[in-house]
Amino acid sequence: EIDFDFLEKTLQKNKKRKIIASFSLASNVTGILSDYKRISEMVRKFKGIVAFDASSFIPYKNISCQYYDALFISSHKLIGGIGGSGLLAIKKDLCGNKPSFAAGGTVGYVSRTSQCYLCNEEALEEGGTPGILQLIRASLAFKIKDSIGIKNIEKKEEILKDYFFEKLKTIPNLILYAKNLKTRLPIFAFNIKGISPFDIAYELSKKYHIETRAGCACAGPYGHDLLGLKDNQKLKTKPGWLRISLHYTHEKEDIDYFFNALNKTIVKLSH
């Protein structure tokens, strides 16, 4: 969870500097949700810019634009979003009159000695061949989400999350990370003592056709904290965990199937 005392001290220490605060709305490892309303209020008290990474958050929840100045979205995490484009929602007053990277489609006119850029903010930051099909796919993915309805999604996710929590308690030698925090998405990261998460993921995929994620999930520094590792510590094997992400299209029967497969896999790999 966010250490708000530390955040307040950091903001206070840097109050005379330009502050750009970027936070993840939800952990892609443990599913822990950030209190974005409190973050936004605190950062803006110091006249800072608020940016949120909504990659893991956006498939399950919505956020009002009043709480951020910039929002980063990965549409491929939504149903139907595979191949969809990444999205940036940003306030116009944060956009300059020059592109971050000059490229085809951003320049209005160029000579040997000068150039002028387009005045359209979207065109300035979309140099090169536009990903039209990718953008259409992203749009359709959000239409599916909206048609299902956020209330229906959240209700189903709570049911699945609680059920999964109870089933986890039946597995011996299981280490669940951030286990005491309930304000989370139905994303779980755990290890089984004495068994490699990579071996478990391989067996679940090969024999039971269950796709999980083994490793550090692009969260190495956070992983060091979760696993109790020291910086620059020499390791004999690659550290990590097994991550399970539930979805509102799942049913309790899918969870039962997973735990049946997990139990059989543990027995097999323990010998």
Please provide the spans of the model-predicted regions.
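Pyridoxal 5′-phosphate
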Residues: 1-271
